[in-house]
Amino acid sequence: MDWTSDRGLALDRKQVAARMHEACDTLRRLPAGQVRGYRSAWPEMVVECLEMAGGDVIVRLAAPSPRAIDRMHEVFGWFIHLKDQRHLAVALWLTCGRSMGPSRAGGLLGIHRDTVRNRRDEALDRIVEGERRRRMAA
């Protein structure tokens, strides 16, 4: 998907939410650093046998493109507009990034779904307004 936010066009709520979802997906597809732990002293042949036998089966998703990683970093920079507003950032990440509905996110956070929805909307508005101001100043 081609995003045009870096070309000076105004962002809206839907674009911010879609970018948040893409950033979460990109983060999920990044390779995780694997700590060898207790296996580091084992002979490589034993480790290979364990892996072939199905031990520690890990499904690897397709790696994200470098452009997707750059867009993810840009989205993470947007959280500066939610500085000192952790409750807004959490509601936004759960609903837009993790694609949870307000009811499920509310159950996880222990708040009503309308509160989650209001926090998400306020966070989206703050990001849209903050990015608009940043682009006008540039």
Where are these regions (language model features)?
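Short low-polarity hydrophobic stretches
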Residues: 23, 90-91, 116
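Residue-level detector of well-ordered alpha-helical segments, enriched
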Residues: 15, 19, 85-89, 119
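DNA major-groove recognition helices of helix-turn-helix
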Residues: 116-134
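Helix-turn-helix DNA-binding module
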Residues: 97-115
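Short amphipathic alpha helix immediately N-terminal
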Residues: 82-100
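Short alpha-helical segments used as structural interaction elements across diverse proteins
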Residues: 16, 68, 83, 110, ...
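N-terminal interaction/assembly modules
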Residues: 1-81, 101-104, 129-138
